[in-house]
Every structure is written in C-alpha cells, then in structure tokens.
C-alpha cells in the first residue's frame, strides 16, 4: 500500500513539474475569463462548460427561439456553432480586401438571441475548413479559382500555400470583428458573450496555427483560442501555439471506455489546460433517400455513458454534438 501511495505521489510530482516547464498562459482579461488545468473561470467563478451544438444555418430563423428554449430548459449554459464561410460570402469579391459580399445578419441575430434573450455563453468555430458534414467543408466554391495549377484543389484548401493563407486571412478579417463585438470581454459584468473561438479544424501545420492566431488577435479577439484534435498544440513550448489549447472529439460508435482513457491522455499531454470534449457525439445524420440516423445511432443511454466516462476521466467541459441537428437546405 505504501509503495502505491509513493508511486501516486511521484506521478503527481512529475505531472506538476511538466506543467510548470510549459510557457505560462496569458489572458487579455483574466478577471473576466481564464482557465487552468482544472476548468474555466468566468468572472471569478469556476464553470463546468455544458454546451449544446446548434447550427443557425441549418434551422429557419423562425424556429431559433424554440431550439434555444429547449437548450436552456435541458440545463445547458453554452451553445456552440460552426460559422461556414460559404454561407456568408457566396459571391466572389473583387479582391482580397473587398468584404462587400459578406452578409453576417443571421449570425449577429443568432448571437444576440443566445446572449441577451436566453443568457447562454457561445463557442464559435469559423474554420475556414469546418468539416461539419457541410458542402465544401465550409469553403466557398469560388475559392477554387485561386488554386495554383499544380495543386489538387482538395489538398490546396487546408494547406499553408500563400494564396490559400491570403484568402484565409480575408475570411478572418471579415468574420472576426463580428465575434469581437459579441465576445464576453466586451460585455458588461454579468452579461453573456462568446467565450471561445476555434482555429482551423484538425490543423497540423504549426506555421498555419501561428498565422491564424494572429488573424484573430489582430482583429480584436481577446477570449481563449482553441483547436480540435491537434496534438501539435498539446504541450507546445512555442510562444504563440502554447497560448492555444486543444480539445478532444469522442465519436458515436465508440466503446464508452475510450471516453475516459482519451480524456486522461489529453490531461497528460496538456497539463496546463482544462480537459474539454469539443464533440461528444450523440448520433449521426440521415440522408434524403438514403440511410437514417437511427441506422447507426446508439440510444441515449450510450451518449449518457460517454459523458459520464469523460467526466470520470477529468473532463470539465462537454459539447453535445449535435443537440439539434437541423437540415442542410442547400
């Protein structure tokens, strides 16, 4: 028994020593929002982030209040959405500095309703690549026009090629000011706002992450930036990347034991940030004339088991993906 206690103490000491060797996290407004290895702290209160995924672009605006009401009544304190570039800038601009084709009216209305009417925090995920079972992964079709001849379009999008990064910056320069206006740090004490912004989905190139982080901060983003299933972020000592934190995904078909072990792995690899599940999947999509979600859906007991096992592993943030699925209308 004494040997076991000694082993546990040695492991805890090594864990803390590793965390202390990593660059200290810097927060623009730590009195409003910050985090450590345990959880998020918002306005001085430790918060378990219980989030529901609900995508405004998949739901008619007339139904938003009904969906928000259900989310609130189910006990969630946060709502998450992707923000697809091809939804907001459908027509090709004249040049990279032209933002006249962007229309963010529905995004602004959705954020305002979440924050002011229903008192929910929000998490936004602007890509530019968003996966999300959405056409083109969120990229506008016109972006392919700028793909260099020697590249396959699917590989060029999500690359660190200068032309791709130029248009990625264009998108961030357009959408980040919308986020900046609605982020928690710009709101009065007690009001709700955006608490996190995600960089490109599953990005592996460090130079891309550094550039995208700069696109955010240069456009006034002050809340924490995160990535999703990006091991390069975990335990990074890079001056910029170390200020990001990575989240995990947990998929609908998994054995629930994996939920706990993956969270434990995340905490070991990233000991200076909270363990957060960006997508705790509760089902899958149906296709018109094809398979139904029920064909691959394990019932609510499985989703509940996944959530409990993630929390048993030490997770202090969960995003149910999706809480409300909606319909791809385009």
Q: Model-flagged regions — what are they?
A:
Residues 64-136, 213-217:
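Aromatic-lined substrate-binding rim segments of carbohydrate-active enzymes
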Residues 19-78:
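N-terminal carbohydrate-binding accessory modules
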Residues 93-102, 127-158, 209-210, 241-246, ...:
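Aromatic- and acidic-residue-enriched segments that line the glycan-binding/catalytic groove
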Residues 103-124, 152-192:
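An active-site-proximal structural segment forming one wall of the substrate-binding cleft
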Residues 4-13:
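Sec-dependent N-terminal signal peptides
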Residues 164-237:
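Active-site neighborhood of glycoside hydrolase catalytic domains
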Residues 79-87, 125-135, 195-201, 229-232, ...:
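Short, solvent-exposed turn/loop segments enriched in Gly/Ser/Thr/Pro and often Arg
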Residues 215-217, 249-330:
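Catalytic-core region of carbohydrate-active enzymes that cleave or remodel glycosidic bonds
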């Amino acid at each position: 028994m004494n040997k076991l206690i000694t082993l546990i103490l040695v492991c805890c000491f090594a864990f803390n020593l590793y965390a202390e060797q990593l660059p200290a996290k810097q927060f623009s407004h730590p009195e409003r929002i910050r985090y450590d290895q345990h959880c998020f702290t918002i306005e001085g209160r430790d918060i378990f982030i219980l989030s529901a995924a609900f995508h405004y672009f998949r739901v008619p605006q007339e139904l938003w209040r009904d969906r928000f009401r259900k989310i609130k009544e189910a006990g969630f304190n946060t709502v998450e959405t992707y923000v697809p570039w091809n939804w907001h800038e459908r027509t090709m601009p004249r040049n990279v500095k032209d933002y006249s084709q962007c229309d963010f009216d529905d995004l602004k209305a959705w954020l305002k309703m979440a924050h002011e009417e229903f008192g929910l925090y929000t998490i936004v995920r602007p890509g530019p690549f968003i996966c999300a079972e959405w056409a083109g992964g969120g990229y506008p079709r016109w972006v392919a026009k700028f793909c260099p001849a020697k590249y396959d379009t699917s590989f060029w999008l999500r690359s660190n090629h200068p032309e791709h990064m130029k248009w990625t910056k264009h998108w961030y320069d357009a959408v980040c000011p919308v986020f900046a206006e609605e982020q928690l740090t710009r709101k009065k004490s007690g009001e709700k706002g955006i608490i996190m912004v995600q960089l490109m989905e599953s990005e592996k190139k460090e130079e891309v992450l550094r550039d995208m982080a700069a696109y955010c901060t240069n456009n006034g983003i002050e809340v924490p930036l995160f990535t999703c299933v990006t091991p390069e972020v975990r335990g990074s000592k890079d001056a910029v990347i170390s200020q990001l934190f990575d989240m995990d995904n947990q998929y609908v078909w998994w054995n629930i034991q994996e939920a706990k072990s993956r969270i434990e792995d995340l905490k070991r690899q990233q000991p200076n940030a909270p363990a957060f599940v960006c997508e705790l999947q509760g089902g899958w999509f149906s296709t018109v004339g094809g398979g139904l979600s029920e064909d691959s859906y394990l019932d609510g007991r499985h989703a509940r088991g996944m959530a409990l096992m993630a929390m048993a592993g030490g997770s202090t943030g969960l995003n149910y993906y999706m809480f409300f699925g909606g319909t791809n209308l385009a």
